Curated annotation (Swiss-Prot):
It comes from the Eukaryota. It comes from Candida albicans (strain WO-1). It is found in: Cell membrane. Belongs to the SHO1 family. Forms homooligomers. This is High osmolarity signaling protein SHO1. Residues 268-315 are annotated as: Disordered. Residues 270-280, 289-298 have a biased composition (Gly residues).
């Protein structure tokens, strides 16, 4: 999680209540310091000291983004502070006419009001009307630095350093990212060309007749020459001439997620499509061990090896992005994604989402239609599974 002032400043309720509490406490401590000590209730000093400790604790919890984990503890602590401030107010008003005592009493009255608000909010259920009204003022357009201790911004700033192809993002120029679902990566529609793909430096192709871990993006052909196409991952020739070594990028086998179904006329056993398209008549839902689709190897391969076919439609535990969604959450409110942030997803109230990476104020989420993105954690509630 980590300490970050942005976690505190992004919550209007936290800013307003903590700021109000500090001002009220300054009024109370100023009145206590200016009053005659023989007429001042000595126990009120402890109540004033206890109150500033509670204010600092709440500030630290908001800054560390774990206020939700200590709400019930805070209810008990703030309730004690409420008793102290109300008792001090009674003693200061009715037992002395000192100006300092009355000033301290005014500060204690303000602190009592603040403590009552905190008790109602921290002790209330997230779906209660009061909590829903307060949470409705939360900022939507913040920079999402809270996700995984700022990993959202860190990954966006370093997008050009190491982005695996088919992992849900492609680089369109410098720093711009365009999401697309890996399940449609083989369609050849709206796919970046090889000129626009910038890959991190990977292992070079071997010198032997075959390779098992490489794939070449040939800028002249504008299509991948993959080592895992059509089930023939171990039979990609390496003696293919490349006329432009400067524009050639290399991918390891871990980068091939989502490119398995790409076809190329230069690779044995693949379809006959060009560019990033699909081979003619290629069956995208099943692959056989024989290395041929209906666009490559013999047609009998798909008929005789039905038991060896693999369904390439992703299951609940295989999303194409390498994320396993371990939790389910219910949307407490409807949310419209920020059009300027391609990573956000929209959802409606009471919709059931699959979530993961639940640290921070922004969680990884997947809708029922398969859309993957991030959602604000204060708009959803984890369900018991």
């Amino acid at each position: 999680m980590g300490f970050s002032l942005s976690n505190f400043t992004s919550d209007p309720f936290a800013i307003s209540t903590v700021s109000f509490g500090i001002m009220a406490w300054v009024v109370a401590i100023a009145g206590a310091a200016s009053s005659k000590q023989e007429n001042f209730p000595h126990f009120s000093w402890w109540g004033i000291s206890y109150q500033i400790v509670i204010i600092l604790i709440i500030f630290v919890l908001y800054a560390n983004n774990n206020i939700e984990l200590y709400k019930f503890t805070l209810v008990g602590l703030v309730s004690i502070a409420f008793i102290y401030t109300t008792n001090s107010t009674n003693n200061l008003i009715y037992n002395s006419n000192s100006a300092g005592n009355l000033c301290c009493a005014a500060g204690c009255i303000l602190l009592s009001i603040l403590n009552l608000i905190w008790i109602l909010y921290f002790g209330g259920h997230p779906e209660s009307p009061t909590n829903q009204f307060i949470d409705s003022f939360s900022l939507r357009g913040q920079g999402h630095e809270q996700l995984g201790s700022g990993s959202h911004n860190h990954n966006a700033n370093n997008a050009n350093n190491n982005i695996p192809i088919g992992a849900g993002n492609a680089i369109i120029g410098k720093g711009e990212m365009s999401p697309y679902d890996d399940r449609f990566a083989a369609s050849g529609v709206n796919q970046p060309t090889s000129e626009s793909l910038r890959l991190a430096s990977g292992p070079q192709m071997g010198n032997g007749p075959f390779t098992t871990t490489g794939a070449i993006i040939n800028p002249n052909l504008q299509q991948p020459l993959s080592g895992s196409i059509g089930g023939s991952a171990h039979h990609t020739p390496t003696n293919i001439n490349n006329n432009n070594n400067n524009n050639t990028g290399y991918m390891t086998s871990s980068h091939l997620t989502g490119l398995e179904n790409f076809s190329s006329p230069h690779v044995p056993g693949s379809g006959t499509g060009a560019g990033l398209g699909v081979g003619a008549g290629r069956d995208l839902t099943h692959n056989s061990n024989g290395g041929g689709g209906s666009g490559g190897g013999p047609a009998s391969a798909n008929n005789s090896n039905n038991t060896n076919k693999r369904n390439t439609i992703y299951t609940d535990s295989e999303t194409g992005t390498g994320i396993t969604f371990r939790y389910k959450a219910k949307a407490l409110y409807s949310y419209d994604a920020n059009p300027d942030d391609i990573n956000e997803i929209s959802f409606v109230k009471d919709e059931i989402l699959e979530v993961d990476d639940i640290d921070g104020k922004w969680w990884q989420a997947r809708r029922a239609n398969g859309q993957v993105g991030i959602c604000p954690s204060n708009y959803v509630k984890l369900l018991d599974t």
